[in-house]
Amino acid sequence: TNGQIERIDQVVEVLGIKLKRIKCAAMEGLVEEGKEVIDSIDKGPLRDAALIGGAQKVEHYEIASYGTLCALAKQLGYTDALRLLKETLEEEKSTDEKLTMLAESGGNQRAAREAA
């Protein structure tokens, strides 16, 4: 999100480092996988469940990435950077929880019925 990008920019500023923006091959792969789901599964509960699962893969990747950055910032004593990174980490965890609730509140059951 824009807020997350702003926080990364703040971390870079606080630490006084230059950041070269690069594309993340892993994230591009997850996005491509989502596109394949859309192209290969008809609209309906099964596709919805697959897309929720794909979105959770993205969130888990982001949680792992921000968790690692938080651990490094803590180890290095970068308290301002840690605060900003933790905020984003908590947002990612919250999004993952919402996706889990969406799947468990009927999305997976509807997909299972459709697949049966």
In which residue ranges do the predicted regions lie?
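Amphipathic alpha-helical hairpins
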Residues: 1-116
